[in-house]
From Swiss-Prot:
Protein's recorded name: Lactose transport ATP-binding protein LacK
This protein's UniProt keywords: ATP-binding, Cell inner membrane, Cell membrane, Membrane, Nucleotide-binding, Sugar transport, Transport
NCBIfam families attached to this UniProt entry: PRK11650.1
Species the sequence originates in: Rhizobium radiobacter
Gene3D superfamilies registered for this protein in UniProt: 2.40.50.100, Nucleic acid-binding proteins, P-loop containing nucleotide triphosphate hydrolases
Record has Membrane as a keyword: yes
Cellular compartment(s): Cell inner membrane
Length: 363
């Protein structure tokens, strides 16, 4: 396996710059996931690594070799797409070995590689079937097998699970994670689904508008986001954002904020660089960090809109004022109220986040 390094990578279409100076290092054997909303540039960046898109400026190296102008077939990469792209008239065995046959590899070596990949992917019993006789998950495993037999330095996955139903996506996430451990492969993976990113990645690259917002381990991004975009994108359900204003400062960098929708709900938070009195800020609270009424550092009242019961966990959708919705996660079937009920929850300063007017985290 090889490391991948991107140095000030940029991509423009005419005067429109879509990738804006990306710097990133993917270590050998690392599983890195590009995640972000549609149009953020994640697939374009992946295609630039693959050689399917030209690099306008910057430097791309794979295994220490500059690859900017190297033909895609000579970059030592294998790519798995959202569409399986299997040949319908070929069997699983023939599909997996096609690229090797096309390259003129010896028949016995092709057979050895195909059989080894089939064993890893548990496709042994399906080798003589054609794609129409396979499920969606099986077809995707064949597509992955076709990449494995090439023994690439780097695997590139472009939203490979998007065409699968929810149950199959969960199953294939487990399969891909297992595959990464077995092969110790360098993988760069693109998805819009932050759950995929959280469950698969060693390192997540959060993108927006062609720039990298933050890079880090999944739980590091969840626990310590740099800005409101990352805080809201990583985590499901998303973080609650409550507009507030700074109403007081104290020694030691502590500030007291009051929620705009509920001025009586006030919270004192310690900050290394405290904002000034009167500054507009936003308090961030994850759904699972709301506490039972009467506990925490302050209380917040809201009116229930909807309660979703998911077995042992419930999600309460409520509003503090019209148009300002919050989501409360409740465990152990705590009573979440019914439509129109007024409920109270506690908020702890230790589990709350503070953001300035630009959306940047105040630490």
């Amino acid at each position: 396996m090889a490391e991948v390094r991107l140095t000030d990578i940029r991509k423009s279409y005419g005067s429109l710059e879509v990738i804006k100076g990306v710097n990133l290092e993917v270590s050998s054997g690392e599983f890195v996931v590009f995640v972000g909303p549609s149009g953020c540039g994640k697939s374009t960046l992946l295609r630039m690594i693959a050689g399917l898109e030209d690099i306008s400026s910057g430097e791309l190296t794979i295994g220490g070799t500059v690859m900017n102008d190297v033909d895609p077939s000579k970059r030592g990469i294998a790519m798995v797409f959202q569409t399986y792209a299997l040949y319908p008239h070929m069997t699983v065995r023939e599909n997996m070995g096609f690229a090797l046959r096309f390259a003129g590899m010896a028949k016995d070596e092709i057979e050895r590689r195909v059989n080894a990949a089939a064993k890893i992917l548990e496709l042994d019993a399906l080798m003589d079937r054609k794609p129409k006789a396979l499920s969606g998950g099986q077809r995707q495993r064949v597509a992955i097998g076709r990449a494995i037999v090439r023994q690439p330095d780097v695997f590139l996955f472009d939203e490979p699970l998007s065409n699968l139903d929810a149950e199959l996506r969960v199953h294939m996430r487990v399969e891909i994670a297992r595959l990464h451990k077995e092969l110790n492969a360098t993988i760069v993976y693109v998805t819009h689904d932050q759950v995929e990113a959280m469950t698969l990645a060693d390192k997540i690259v959060v993108m927006r508008g062609g720039i990298v917002e933050q890079v880090g381990a999944p739980l590091a991004l969840y626990d310590d986001p740099d800005n409101m975009f990352v805080a809201g994108f990583i985590g499901s359900p998303r973080m609650n954002f409550l507009p507030a204003v700074v109403i007081g400062q104290a020694e030691g960098g502590q500030v007291t904020v009051a929620l705009k929708a509920r001025p009586d709900t006030q919270l004192t938070v310690a900050c290394a660089t405290p904002p000034q009195g009167g500054d507009a800020v936003t308090v961030g609270v994850r759904p699972e960090h709301f506490l039972p009424a009467g506990s925490g550092d302050t209380q917040l009242t809201a009116h229930v809109d909807v309660v979703e019961h998911l077995g042992n966990t419930s999600y309460v959708y409520a509003h503090t004022v019209p148009g300002e919705q919050i989501i409360i996660e409740q465990e152990e079937r705590r009573h979440g109220g019914r439509y129109g009920d007024e409920i109270a929850v506690g908020i702890s300063a230790k589990t709350s986040f503070l953001f300035d007017a630009s959306g940047r985290r105040i630490r």
